[in-house]
Amino acid sequence: MIEAIINGLNYRLNEETLTAEVTAKRNGYEGDIIIPENVVFNDVTYRVTSIGEYAFRYCESLTSIVIPESVTSIGEYAFYECLSLTDITFQGTMAQWNEIILREDWNNNTPAKVVHCTDGDVEI
């Protein structure tokens, strides 16, 4: 596994599967975040497939997040206490969102009540 910072987001890169997981950042994230479907590190492309546990925990100034359709799991407490997070967008369909593995309390204490998908909204 490789730890890398790419365009302001922290990732854990798996060299065997060529996948990437978004991980926590020391000083947290803020504002509007767009997670890309793929990231490139040392000329190797990795597909972003997960948001790690605690990745955005206590990011009180995070206001919106765009999640690519390549994400298949969101870790426990990933968005815990993101008190300003009002807008979650998933770049896939509602059916794809419902297939994502959502770990315990992934969105605990966030004001967002729906995930906006390409074909409608899913209540959370």
Where are these regions (language model features)?
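N-terminal low-complexity, Pro/Thr/Ser-rich intrinsically disordered segments
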Residues: 1-6
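Structural signature of tandem-repeat unit edges
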Residues: 8-10, 15-19, 28-50, 59-73, ...
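Acidic, Ser/Thr
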Residues: 24-26
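Consensus positions within tandem repeat domains that build extended binding/scaffold surfaces
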Residues: 53-55, 75-80
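A structural signal for leucine-rich repeat
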Residues: 80, 100-105
